[in-house]
Regions:
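Carbohydrate-active catalytic/glycan-binding domains of CAZyme proteins
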Residues: 1-578
Length: 578
């Protein structure tokens, strides 16, 4: 039986993967944008089965995150290991910009941020050469196009990792692989044989996303582009390819000398939508005539690959040893043909504690939440608590769909923009979410289940008061805007619409969302065994094609006073996602 790697290796909204190997262990970090805690870190022994071991950015090490459009925050981390220390270099658009955190143990604790005020631009990366010298590279408007105008390019500088400062001025080493290629970014450097290899993303992170390669014999020399660029993309496969938006790669060498790349991509739903956002995929890489060749033989990301033989042998040697995480639960490759868009659905406990990717069973019987849970923005007030085997969310004044604001660095560190919202990523194309809520709204208060995408595109299944009546209703929120929030002149207007409404007087209610692709069936009842349908909603109305594809769907529980701080609390007895 041939063991397999199944894509995506980390399903759901876990984009911009960066990977490193330390001995027999593999570690991977992803972007988290405006979620808190931030920058999830995963561990694997076989590249197939990943377990989250921590968040690098937490309340304990001074993490600030502001809820806004969903597309700000922290993005494009690079994870590296050198001389007994792990490094994550990243950009926080809700704080001072570029920073580094370090840890002796990748499971934490991670240091407080070392702010890199002398590091320009975004998507900074660290590189340690064979002699141990560190270098920093990044993305910025550094390339002179010959007309006196600076264009986006890649820069490189020697770096002092002990004092977190650049040694000398940054040197521009590359602009784009293709002439006037859009958005060259996310650079990583590798020293392989006689060459330094530069891997970047290009084309923007949507349909035209791509991986580009360049090389130089001298670190600060001229980097020649690979004549075969792009070395990986799906943009030539049309807008209905089941795997789309491929790019943003990082490479890792295995103990036997073989290579793999982790990269982001999206699964297409019903040939048009990408509600799950950008996920983490993997593919083999071989070296041919001095260049990296991604996914040899096919040149595209496959749903499955043969597992690395060296890791299969290591895992099989551990079977029966009791080390289940190291041995893994391999797939046998017997996936049915014609299941385009469906492969990669998580099965089993691939996550941490009680929950796997897309599998959550939460009865709130512990004060410690599992890694699958996230807040939207940092919670500054005590608007949530776990007591008496229930989650309690307070009806604070902020709502989930407040008017959007322009995105800037160094935002205000206050309670002004927090929300009482606790959510999990949607990791499966077909998902059922159910929860039990106890809540009697007054005034403008509301609470319930929310399906949240970026840019105020949301569904709320909520208990509220409407024209003096106690009701259950499904609300749709959308936003019209002129440019992305990180562009000058951003302006937007949020609209709301009642999709369905029914009277409901009881304090307790069970809420359910049955998501089957883009068909959202909304149900409710007194118990989970006595549910009836409220309506069927269209998931396409909030899919990333409407709002840009930076983030993915979050589903969770919320409470709000809709403009007023109230003393009422919504109580959630349990939550399930399957």
């Amino acid at each position: 039986m041939q063991k397999k790697l199944t894509n995506p290796i980390i399903p759901g909204f876990y984009p911009d993967p960066s990977i490193c190997r330390v001995g027999e262990d593999y570690y991977l970090a992803c972007s988290s944008f405006e979620l808190c805690p931030g920058v999830p870190v995963f561990h694997s022994r076989d590249l197939a089965h990943w377990e989250q071991i921590c968040y690098a950015m937490t309340l304990e090490n001074g993490f600030h995150m502001e809820r806004n459009s969903g597309v700000g925050g922290v993005m494009a981390p690079t994870l590296r290991y050198h001389d007994g220390l792990f490094y994550i270099i990243n950009t926080n658009f809700s704080d001072r910009g570029n920073y580094i955190v370090t840890a002796e143990n990748p499971a934490g604790p991670w240091s407080e941020p070392h702010w890199l005020d002398d590091v320009p631009g975004i998507d900074a990366s660290l590189f340690f050469d064979d002699d141990g010298q560190a270098y920093i590279l990044g993305t910025g408007d550094v390339w002179d196009n010959g007309t006196g105008v600076k264009e986006r390019g890649i820069w490189l500088a020697k770096y002092d990792v002990e004092h977190f400062r650049m040694l000398g001025e940054p040197v521009t080493i590359f602009n784009s692989a293709l002439r006037v290629g859009a958005s060259p970014e996310s650079p990583h450097l590798y020293h392989v044989g006689d060459y330094y290899y530069l891997i970047i993303a290009e084309g923007g992170t949507e349909h035209y996303h791509a991986v580009m390669a360049a090389r130089s014999r001298e670190l600060f020399g001229f980097y020649e582009g690979n004549p075969a660029n792009p070395v990986m993309t799906h943009r030539h496969m049309g807008f209905q390819s089941p795997i789309i938006n491929v790019g943003h790669a990082d490479l890792v060498e295995l103990p036997d000398g073989s290579w793999y790349a982790v990269l982001l991509a999206s699964r297409l739903i019903e040939g048009k939508c990408k509600n799950l956002g950008r996920e983490t995929f993997i593919c083999p890489v071989v070296w041919e005539r001095g260049w990296p060749l991604f996914s040899p033989k096919t040149g595209k990301i496959e749903w499955e690959y043969d597992a690395p033989l060296c890791l299969v042998r290591d895992a099989e040697s551990l079977e029966g040893s009791g080390d289940a995480a190291a041995a893994g639960l391999w797939t046998d490759g017997n996936r049915e043909e014609g299941a385009a868009g469906m492969p990669g659905e998580p099965g089993g406990d691939a996550g941490s504690g009680k929950s796997g990717f897309g599998l959550v069973r939460e009865e709130f019987d512990s004060e410690t939440l599992d890694f699958c849970w996230s807040f939207w923005g940092r919670p500054y007030r005590d608007f949530y608590k776990i007591a008496d085997s229930a989650l309690h969310l307070k009806c604070i004044r902020q709502s989930l769909a407040e008017e959007l604001r322009p995105m800037t660095f160094d935002m205000e560190k206050s309670e002004a923009y927090e929300t009482a919202f606790l959510a999990c990523r949607q990791c499966s194309i077909h998902t059922t979410v159910t929860c039990k809520m106890k809540f009697l709204p007054a005034g403008q208060e509301s609470a319930g289940l929310a399906v949240v995408q970026a840019m105020n595109h949301q569904y709320h299944l909520e208990r509220a008061k409407s024209q003096g009546r106690q009701v259950l209703r499904l609300m749709l929120y959308t936003a019209d805007y002129n440019v992305p929030p990180y562009f000058p002149g951003f302006a937007s207007t949020t609209c709301e619409q009642v999709i369905a409404e029914t009277p409901w007087e009881a304090e307790e209610i069970v809420l359910r969302l049955e998501i089957r692709g883009e068909r959202f069936r909304v149900c409710f009842g007194e118990t989970r065994d006595e549910l009836r349908e409220l309506c069927v909603a269209d998931g396409e109305l909030i899919n990333p094609e409407k709002v840009g594809c930076m983030t993915g769907t979050m589903i969770g529980m919320y409470a709000t006073g809709n403009g007023e701080d109230c003393e009422n609390w919504a109580e959630f007895g349990w939550f399930e996602m399957e």
